Amino acid sequence: MLDTNMKTQLKAYLEKLTKPVELIATLDDSAKSAEIKELLAEIAELSDKVTFKEDNSLPVRKPSFLITNPGSNQGPRFAGSPLGHEFTSLVLALLWTGGHPSKEAQSLLEQIRHIDGDFEFETYYSLSCHNCPDVVQALNLMSVLNPRIKHTAIDGGTFQNEITDRNVMGVPAVFVNGKEFGQGRMTLTEIVAKIDTGAEKRAAEELNKRDAYDVLIVGSGPAGAAAAIYSARKGIRTGLMGERFGGQILDTVDIENYISVPKTEGQKLAGALKVHVDEYDVDVIDSQSASKLIPAAVEGGLHQIETASGAVLKARSIIVATGAKWRNMNVPGEDQYRTKGVTYCPHCDGPLFKGKRVAVIGGGNSGVEAAIDLAGIVEHVTLLEFAPEMKADQVLQDKLRSLKNVDIILNAQTTEVKGDGSKVVGLEYRDRVSGDIHNIELAGIFVQIGLLPNTNWLEGAVERNRMGEIIIDAKCETNVKGVFAAGDCTTVPYKQIIIATGEGAKASLSAFDYLIRTKTA
């Protein structure tokens, strides 16, 4: 199951175990059970602190296995294959169970240990999902730290019947105590906040105690990370707040145009950015979103950022780097069937539609790439483009047109998502040339029509254009003194990762120039 390189790496990790780990498998006669048995046996051979045994009498999913300590039944369970993107989740579960500490903040770990209540989590994932590991790892860690928290990570490809029965049409999909809990990427902090009543209030109280910053960067994607590094290198008090470190690149799989890095993945790049930021004295505030900007009353005064949790942070200068989010179609049925057939991530959710008919909305690079990827999984793909021609690179268009199970419809205006009350069953569109209405029967709709800036919270505070982008000059200055902006949330042309990082650096230098030239009020 594991090649020589993987075994060598895993053996090195297992040397960090400080207490014994037991792998308890519950198997049947399936081929998948045989694979898991082989995998666990190989892992046990790599360390004298790891043992493996079978107990097929347990009333749990088959095949599955528990990662625990001898004499205990506490710990995370994997049902199905833990390979692909989830192999890292498996390795971390082994380390945490074996006594190796998590890198999460001690205050958060203590909060998890003291959560009062019984919670049985189930997370459905796909092996190609790059968003799933964050959720699986967060819940695995919680199950290691708190005996009243159980977690089973379930491979949707192995347990397809459960995917169908529960109408899971997007991953990661999390259930707690048998009820839907959440869909999509969630951080450990966000999960804890949802089950630990009072956590948000405590977080706000703690943030309110923080001293004013010289520069506070709102948004922790590439632009925000670059701004934080450049600011901290100037020796000024720097804060960096955001909902999730990495921002939109966490939803990007392959990145091949970040100069000097021939190929990487969004999560890897986000991780590298975090490591770089952590090299400097930056106060990183995770899982916090801004709800309002209150500009300083006088030049040189303190600007205020109100957070969604109710906290107020103050700073002499602000850099807004809140990025953008997926654009919606804004048609009837889209909201109702979001995660029930309407999705925005072909890499995460594509495997859930294996053998089914789907549509991709949008003929730009992202839409055409999605259609190409999906064509190798699903029965049939219909790509609908609003304009008379696709905007994707010609090499991508040529590849798409070569695929036999893909139809391309131009001048198509999507008008409605059709459903049966629980899931998507079709799509309605209007031919923009003839005006005729057409219906397509399908199970999934992948929306790839661009991005919208995350700037609604700035209403009335800074000038924005009709698209909602923050209007900036060549130095990333807004119309408000001491407030700067960078990246995809601004009017800067071409929304690219490398451009965002450059703009973040520029905004930081401009903010520093403002600080040294402006007398404190």
UniProtKB/Swiss-Prot annotation:
Entry cofactors: FAD
Cofactor binding remark: Binds 1 FAD per subunit.
CDD domains (alphabetical): AhpF_NTD_C, AhpF_NTD_N
The protein's Enzyme Commission number: 1.8.1.-
Binding-site positions, FAD: 214-229, 478-488
Subunit architecture: Homodimer.
Annotated family: Belongs to the class-II pyridine nucleotide-disulfide oxidoreductase family.
Further remarks about this protein from its record: The active site is a redox-active disulfide bond.
Name this polypeptide is given: Alkyl hydroperoxide reductase subunit F
